[in-house]
């Protein structure tokens, strides 16, 4: 039985970009929703490619 370790997530650059946007007045809730969507998309792609 083989085990595949799949890594996924957001880059520090992406998180810092959204942090800067919030500091400049971008809606925090919208920023968090978009980051979550990016994370879920990255997760789906990583898991699909591991199959």
From Swiss-Prot:
It comes from the Viruses. One of its GO terms (biological process) is symbiont-mediated suppression of host cell division. Keywords: Early protein, Host-virus interaction. Interacts with host FtsZ. Plays a role in the inhibition of host cell division. Interacts with and inhibits the major host cytoskeletal protein in bacterial division FtsZ to confer growth advantage to the phage. This is Gene 0.4 protein.
């Amino acid at each position: 039985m083989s085990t595949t370790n799949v890594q996924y997530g957001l880059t520090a650059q992406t998180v810092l970009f959204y942090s800067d946007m919030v500091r400049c007045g971008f809606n925090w809730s919208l920023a968090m929703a978009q980051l979550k969507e990016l994370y879920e998309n990255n997760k789906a792609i990583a898991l699909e490619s591991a199959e």
